[in-house]
Amino acid sequence: SFTSTVNGFKEVGSIADITFNVNFSRGSITPQYSAENNYRSGSPTTYNYNGPVGSEVKANNTLTDTKTITGYSIAIGNNTFSCSVDYSIGTQPKSSKGNDYNSPLPAGTLAAKSVTITGVYPVYNGIGTLSKIPLQAHGTAIAVDAPADMVVGGNRFTIQYPNVWSGKTPIVQQENELSKAWDNQNMSEYEITDINISGVPYKQ
């Protein structure tokens, strides 16, 4: 297995310390009569890490390995890290009579497993002081519940979303008190402007 202490959606430009944990299974010989041991493969020899920060080959013949990256800056999109494991030749299987049975598993490489951290820009909403909504994939539908009173103290309810979402068409819906359905509102009543947040183009 290959796991990471950081995963899922993270804000672009945020700094993370990431620890990767690898557990290697040598498999088993079943049934195991009189072989030297019941493991199908030999011990691991090297753990091969790859990712946006480059590659590293770590010599290690134990079944677990750990790698830590400190101060990693989350990039936009997929930040994919992987690890493959090289292992030595396995034990010679034996038959119930103690004879060699087939051949030992040759030395080889366990195919790489990967974890992905997705860097995204946040979406903000609110009146006056805006707050971030939970991070989500760029281009997916942004759904926020507006308050009944959309103007407070001269400030209007506002949504700010990065331009990577600009291919989406904003829609405002209001619940119809009679039908209880959600009706689309006239978008000409709403203003969409270009703004900049920390150097990132946004729509508001």
Feature map (PLM): residue ranges:
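Hydrophobic/tyrosine-rich beta-strand signature of extracellular beta-sandwich/beta-rich modules
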Residues: F81-V85
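Short, solvent-exposed loop/turn segments at the edges of extracellular beta-sandwich modules
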Residues: D86-S103
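Surface-exposed, short loops/turns at beta-strand junctions within beta-sandwich domains
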Residues: L63, T68-T80, G90, D194-G199, ...
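Preference for solvent-exposed, low-hydrophobicity sequence contexts
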Residues: D100-Y101, V120-Q204
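Proline/serine/threonine-rich low-complexity linkers at boundaries of modular beta-sandwich domains
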Residues: S1-F2
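Short, solvent-exposed loop/linker segments at the N-terminal edge
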Residues: V6-D17
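Short beta-strand segments within Ig-like beta-sandwich modules, predominantly Fibronectin type-III
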Residues: V53-T64
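Acidic, Ser/Thr
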Residues: N21-S28
